[in-house]
Amino acid sequence: MRFPAASVAVDSTPQLRLLQMKDSHETYSTVQLVHSPLPEKGPNSVLVDVPQQISRRKPTAEQSFVSGSDSSRSSTKSSSGSRPVMTTTADPNIVTAASTESVSSSPKWLPKKADTDDRVQRSRERNRIHARKTRQRKKEQMQSLEGRATDLKHEQIRLKQIINEKNTANILVGLFSKGQSQSPNEDPRVEALMYRSVEEIPDPSKIPELPALILPGQHASKKIKVAVPVVAASPQSMSDGGGEEVASTSDVSGDEQQVPDDGIDYDLLGKDRSKCTPEELDQIRRERNRMHAKRTRDRKRIFTEEMAEMCRILEEENHLLRVHLGGLDSDFKSESTTTSTHVVDRIDSVLSTPTLASCAPPQDMVSVSLSPSQLPSKPSTKEVAFNQLQTLLDVAGSFERQQREAERKVPQMCSISAASDTSTSDSSHHHRQRRCHKGDSDRPVKRQRYQVPRSITTTTSLAAPVGW
């Protein structure tokens, strides 16, 4: 913007000159100029740049020229751009406040501020990425610890089941040994693990959580309600010692309100919100957020430490069970080899009797003509135990069959002795019945019932007629 033509009056004071400009709105503005001695030769003219505040108020006034003589008055236009530049002719000592930048160009501090904001934004984004990765890493660590603890628990249950099966097999093998088998000295820790139930095995769900924190001044009414019934229920509440009990309960409630010294301003958090200023409320909010964040970190840290300790304990217990199981395997092999000979000897002695010779189980014999490649392989421990049990069942079955045959022979002997004492008519009748029974091979042998004779009579056979 340019000044329109205006009347100019210059003061004749040598130290100070006042330029009065009258614009189109008949308003005056004064500009104070600093006077400096001018050279004797050459034109004396100064281009004055109106300050920014004056240009904002008076957008029509921008620049003026001051001449050394009263008669020379002129105005020139600047050709340096959209904004004029204040220049001095013939006097380098005059200080000017001209600006070399145009209005359309941006200030110098704008690029620096933009770079600073961009750098801060990148830093915040980088921090968010690191925080997210840290949370994800801790979450995966906790999940891995939980899975490890669960696997160790299942492994311990499986080891205990295998040990119980081995103990049962050792008991069955020890029944046929000549002497009483002495059980090996077990580790008391292993014995305690074997008698421990599945519910008592450590589990991630049994880890205690961080206790709730009661801030000072909060839930005070609940504490009083809980403390009063305790005093009323005591038998000495109505006696002289009631006052002492009330004092003790108040002391306990005061002790319960003790908070840890962890850098959190709990006194500020315990203030009454209705009596706080907005600044204090904002400070309380920030402090509360800090407290919750810190307790969350502490809770995760405690859970991780407890899980690591639980995994370590389960690994030690499983190692003890594996060592004990290895000892049982070696003992079972040695006992099976020593007792197998005794079992075979007892079975041979039982089967050597004539009544059980026919009931002896077949034995697999190795032919001499077999080549070494055709020899049977060495049976495993389970096969040996199974063969021993099968042999025992066969022996028990042979004893049962022998007893049945003995019971069948007793009625036959009784029937023969009774038939000799009866009359001839009865004996013939019995002989016919016996023949009928012998002819019927499908029916099982049954015990015959005979009547006891009441008297013994003798009969003479009738003489045959002559010529019969």
Curated annotation (Swiss-Prot):
Residues 247-256 have a biased composition (Polar residues). Residues 129-138 have a biased composition (Basic residues). Residues 285-312 are annotated as: Basic motif 2. It comes from the Eukaryota. It is found in: Nucleus. The keyword DNA-binding applies. Residues 112-128, 401-410 have a biased composition (Basic and acidic residues). One of its GO terms (biological process) is positive regulation of gene expression. GO terms for cellular component: nucleus. CDD domains: bZIP_AUREO-like. Residues 64-82, 95-106, 417-426 have a biased composition (Low complexity). It holds the Pfam family bZIP_2. Residues 117-165, 279-333 form the bZIP domain. Residues 55-149, 234-272, 400-468 are annotated as: Disordered. Residues 313-320 are annotated as: Leucine-zipper 2. Residues 119-139 are annotated as: Basic motif 1. Induction: By nitrogen deficiency. GO terms for molecular function: DNA binding; DNA-binding transcription factor activity, RNA polymerase II-specific; RNA polymerase II cis-regulatory region sequence-specific DNA binding. PROSITE patterns: BZIP. Keywords: Activator, DNA-binding, Nucleus, Transcription, Transcription regulation. The keyword Nucleus applies. Residues 145-159 are annotated as: Leucine-zipper 1. Transmembrane segments: none annotated. Transcriptional activator which binds to the C-box-like motif 5'-TGACGT-3' and A-box-like motif 5'-GTACGTA-3' of target promoters to positively regulate the expression of genes involved in the tricarboxylic acid (TCA) cycle in response to nitrogen starvation. May also regulate the TCA cycle during day-to-night transitions. Belongs to the bZIP family. This is bZIP transcription factor 14. It comes from Phaeodactylum tricornutum (strain CCAP 1055/1). The lineage of its organism: Eukaryota, Sar, Stramenopiles, Ochrophyta, Bacillariophyta.
